[in-house]
């Protein structure tokens, strides 16, 4: 059984590195925004098998208060031997619910094109032209919450 738990940014780094950017130094997968994000791990027993990080932006409104309006998930990584077993679906469902609970009206990500069909299953659609991070093609995908 898969259990989703809040984790620290530091707990995400090894999996982010080994799955997403194994040819880069470990620091490549650390981002400045990590300290302000919400980080979740999918666990099988006590083994961390997938990670995702959620960042909620705030925008000033007429009252001067700052309210969440958009959420972005980043650094979504699943151990290869756990891919295509529903773990990513469980984790992304959790993040969609969390984004809604935090008041976001839009959830988006920079998606690797080889994962586009996965994101479409959640109702996400591409909203940008293809762009590259190194040799890897991406597009921005978005979901109205």
Give the role of each language-model region.
Residues 1-48:
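Short amphipathic alpha-helix that is part of the acyltransferase structural core
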């Amino acid at each position: 059984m898969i259990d989703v738990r809040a984790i620290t940014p530091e707990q995400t780094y090894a999996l982010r590195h080994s799955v997403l950017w194994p040819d880069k130094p470990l620091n490549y997968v650390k981002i400045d925004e990590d300290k302000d994000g919400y980080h979740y791990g999918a666990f099988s027993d006590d083994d961390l098998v997938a990670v995702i990080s959620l960042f909620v932006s705030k925008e000033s409104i007429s009252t001067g208060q700052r309210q969440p309006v958009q959420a972005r998930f980043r650094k979504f990584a699943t151990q290869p031997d756990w891919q295509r077993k529903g773990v990513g679906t469980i984790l992304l469902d959790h993040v969609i619910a969390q984004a809604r609970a935090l008041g976001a009206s839009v959830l988006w990500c920079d998606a690797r094109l080889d994962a586009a069909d996965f994101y479409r299953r959640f109702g996400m659609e591409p909203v940008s032209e293809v762009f590259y991070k190194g040799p890897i093609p991406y597009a921005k995908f978005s979901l109205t919450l």
